[in-house]
Amino acid sequence: MERNIKEEGKFRYVEIGEGTPIIILHGLMGGLSNFDGVSDYFPKKGYKVVLPELPIYTLNILKTNIKAFAKFVHDFVKHKKYEKIILLGNSLGGHIALYYTKMHPESVEALIITGSSGLYESAMGDSYPRRGDYEFIKKKAEDVFYDPAVATKEIVDDVFTTVNDRIKLI
């Protein structure tokens, strides 16, 4: 689903609904579109869903770490003047959410993590993603979800583009 991305200073984000903010942090190869179901569901239940675009590929390589990403989230929360948030993080976003919550527990009403780094995960097996092999990436993307149909062509294309972009290589 296409969303209107707001830009305010260094922040790019999608914001849907009114109420207690649920800030959703995407993973390393994730994007805002990964959360279409969540962003459609929770505003109807009285929540504001906020999906900031993390600066994963735009930060200086020496500042590309969990602590810097958590600071970015903290700056975003202050920018939006949120007092209490629900924080939901997936994969790398889960790791960032854990660190943020440790550093700023007073502002986190609830924490939800899925597939957070640091937890056992075997989606890529014991190998690295193979560049240029679309079918390999498609299969691995399908393995991430309980229902492989969730790994739409758009999601697979996004992961394939990221894996094959040497500038985004971390």
Segments and roles (model prediction):
Residues 36, 74, 98-102:
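Short, hydrophobic alpha-helix immediately C-terminal to the catalytic nucleophile
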Residues 21, 48, 83-86, 107-110:
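Structural signature of beta-strand start/N-cap positions in the alpha/beta core
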Residues 89, 93, 97:
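Gly/Ala-rich beta-loop-alpha elbow adjacent to hydrolase catalytic centers
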